[in-house]
A protein has these predicted regions:
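Hydrophobic alpha-helical connector segments
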Residues: 2-32, 84-91
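C-terminal peripheral helix-coil segments that are non-catalytic and often amphipathic
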Residues: 20-27, 63, 67-75, 89-93, ...
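Short hydrophobic/aromatic-rich motifs at helix boundaries and adjacent loops
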Residues: 10-12, 37-42, 72, 91-94
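Residue-level recognition of alpha-helical structural elements
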Residues: 14, 50, 54, 80, ...
Length: 130
């Protein structure tokens, strides 16, 4: 995550940063991570009695997303009808849902291409307001 945040153009809008970040992240996952490993990670998160690492708010993933979304709300790029935390939850749920479905389907479709088609619809709602 930190590597991606370091290469994203700081002059991009938050909308475009999120599109870029998601595209690059999902491409990396699709091309370098074994789908069975991803399935194992997700299943272990459901049954663990300990910390659920995918939900740890101090992860760099959440820090970067919170900063990006907060900045977009403050600048008026995203409508302020939702809090940064609410939009962060929606965005993170979106990514987890796609990753879960991709793993469930054994990676039989392009995760990157599918997300490239769907994510703009989610982000449009951030702009228009929920």
């Amino acid at each position: 995550y930190e590597e991606l945040a370091g290469i994203v153009d700081p002059d991009l809008s938050a909308y475009d940063k999120l599109l870029f970040f998601n595209h690059e992240l999902f491409y990396m996952i699709e091309t370098t991570i074994d789908v069975n490993l991803l399935a194992s990670l997700y299943s272990s998160q459901l049954i663990t009695k300990d910390k659920r690492s995918l939900l740890e708010s101090d992860r760099y993933y959440f820090t970067w997303l919170t900063d990006t979304i907060s900045g977009a709300i403050e600048s008026g790029e995203f409508k302020n009808t939702s809090t940064p935390q609410e939009l962060l939850k929606i965005y993170a749920m979106y990514e987890r849902a796609l990753l879960y479905d991709w793993a469930l389907c054994k990676g039989n479709y392009s995760l990157t291409e599918y997300s490239d088609k769907l994510l703009p619809h989610v982000l449009d709602q951030f702009v228009e307001g929920f």
